[in-house]
Amino acid sequence: MPLIVHISDLHVSELGFDEDVFIKAVAEINAINPDMIILTGDLTNNGYYNEFVQATKYLGMFDAPLFAVPGNHDARNLGYETFEELIGECSWKLTKDDEFVVIGLDSSSPDISSGNVGRPQHLWMEHQLDQCVIDELFSIVALHHHVI
């Protein structure tokens, strides 16, 4: 069975981000040698370019592959564009392994804390989950906001 680590809400910024705590967390995560790390948004606090640059340096400290979806803080100040440039695709995405599938949804909107998954994205997710049942794969749906 694969070992997957979930992290969220790092809020990398000049103020309020505790680098020492993060570095300790990275060491503990790397020590357990996970197969994947899933990051479910709010990597940055304000979506500023310099926050994303700083965040990519921190994320580079992980030994395992990273699967990331954006949060509402990442979408601020055109951060969704920087997310795609430096982290990866913001929109719906999928990664498959022999044992599991991670389905990533984008529930973020700038300055809207409640989040939203629209109908087209929901239908796409349903299709992916149906395929997971057919293929008998363990499935994980990753998004920043709560489902209910």
What is each stretch, according to the model?
Residues 15-18, 41-60, 75-88, 114-115:
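Metal-dependent catalytic neighborhoods of phosphoester/phosphodiester hydrolases
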Residues 27-36, 115-148:
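His/acidic metal-ligating clusters that form di-metal
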Residues 1-54:
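N-terminal active-site segment of His-dependent metallophosphoesterases
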Residues 64-91, 98-103, 107-111, 119-120:
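Active-site neighborhood of divalent metal-dependent phosphoester bond hydrolases
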Residues 62-66, 136-137:
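A short helix->loop->beta-strand "cap" motif at the edges of active sites that frequently abuts
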